[in-house]
């Protein structure tokens, strides 16, 4: 079993021995047990409140192995708008509902939700159901490690 306890400063020269694909929700868990594809058990034991991001590198406490976190493709809704103002309005309404949202200049991405999908469609956005990596904003207080 690998026990990951330390976040390592990203460095392209590091020799990563394993990748750990996690959904957005799983990347918010600071203490959790995962079983990866080959049956190996990985245990996260990070400081409470740690939110992992795609590309983060963690170190195993026993042998020092380095594991890269990868944003795992998952079901999402992608919303696009005819104007940036409409996209900003949609982001505002989703924020009022405290919904995790990935925000870019050209689209918003959120977890599937029929009520929110209907709301966004009524606002005039085009919604596409996809399976992609989901990287929502951390919020004003969510970023607690250096990048």
Curated annotation (Swiss-Prot):
Its main location: cytoplasm. One of its GO terms (biological process) is urea metabolic process. Pfam families: UreE_C, UreE_N. CDD domains: UreE. One of its GO terms (cellular component) is cytoplasm. GO terms for molecular function: nickel cation binding; unfolded protein binding. The keyword Chaperone applies. It is found in: Cytoplasm. Keywords: Chaperone, Cytoplasm, Nickel, Nickel insertion. Gene3D superfamilies: Urease metallochaperone UreE, N-terminal domain, UreE, C-terminal domain. Belongs to the UreE family. Involved in urease metallocenter assembly. Binds nickel. Probably functions as a nickel donor during metallocenter assembly. This is Urease accessory protein UreE. It comes from Trichormus variabilis (strain ATCC 29413 / PCC 7937) (Anabaena variabilis). The lineage of its organism: Bacteria, Bacillati, Cyanobacteriota, Cyanophyceae, Nostocales.
């Amino acid at each position: 079993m690998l026990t990951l306890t330390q976040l390592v400063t990203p460095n392209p020269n590091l020799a990563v021995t394993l990748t750990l694909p996690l959904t957005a929700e799983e990347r918010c868990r600071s203490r959790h047990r995962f079983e990866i594809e080959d049956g190996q058990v990985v245990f996260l034991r990070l400081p409470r409140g740690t939110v992992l991001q795609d590309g983060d590198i963690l170190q195993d406490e026993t042998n020092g192995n380095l594991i890269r976190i990868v944003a795992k493709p998952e079901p999402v809704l992608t919303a696009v708008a005819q104007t940036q103002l409409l996209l900003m309005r949609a982001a505002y309404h989703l924020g009022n509902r405290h919904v995790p949202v990935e925000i870019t200049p050209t689209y918003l991405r959120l977890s599937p939700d029929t009520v929110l999908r209907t709301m966004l469609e009524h606002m005039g956005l085009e919604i596409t159901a996809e399976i992609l990596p989901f990287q929502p904003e951390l919020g004003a207080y969510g970023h607690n490690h250096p990048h």
